[in-house]
Amino acid sequence: MIGGLLSDLVVALPLLALLAVLADAIAAPRGCGVMGARTVYGLAVLLLAALLGFGVLLFLTGAPMVSAAGVAILAASLSLISNIKRKVLGEPLVFSDFALIGAVFRHPQFYLSAMRPWQVAVLAGGLGGLALTLVLLSNAWLAPRLAGVAFSFGAWAGLTLSLARIRRTGFAIVPDPEADVARLGLVPCLLAQWHIWRASVDPLPCDAEPIAGLSGQLVVIVQCE
């Protein structure tokens, strides 16, 4: 069993890295390096994030190849969703967009109207196929699950150090999602935004005196996304 697991990992881990890089390359805007490459820090965070996802799925399924494919499908789906948002609203995904996940299910027609039929089919088919594959190809072996735990903890430790290093470079002091994604990549950019948000201090509450409005006063609020 151990020998079979090692042989599977020898194939699955390089495949995981390749698919993660290809999935990130789909996300617009492209990188500024040679052939659209991201920075070294962005690549490191991407591979560590892929390894973390791989470890979690390996713990859940016990199947290395399925776990690698699952991470690739999720990363490619994020890139596709980000490209659609960028086409409609002019910017790629940002960390705060995940607060709107509930709105996607409450008002799906708003988001589906921005997608072409083939994009809906690819996204639904990919996520549905991933769920079905995870159910059908999972096994009860203990060794892969222990390996998944080890990969997850190792990747989490590496991500913590890498994201702290990115924060110290002054990342996102002035928000610029286009430039940030071009430099780091989509998933590294989302994780860096989350890390900076976690480290930020909440502002003090406003202590200004309330302004008394006129009776029957009309207030118009316009929200733009």
Residue ranges of predicted features:
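Transmembrane and membrane-interface helices of multi-pass
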Residues: M1-D176
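Soluble catalytic regions of membrane-associated enzymes that act on cell-envelope
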Residues: R168-C224
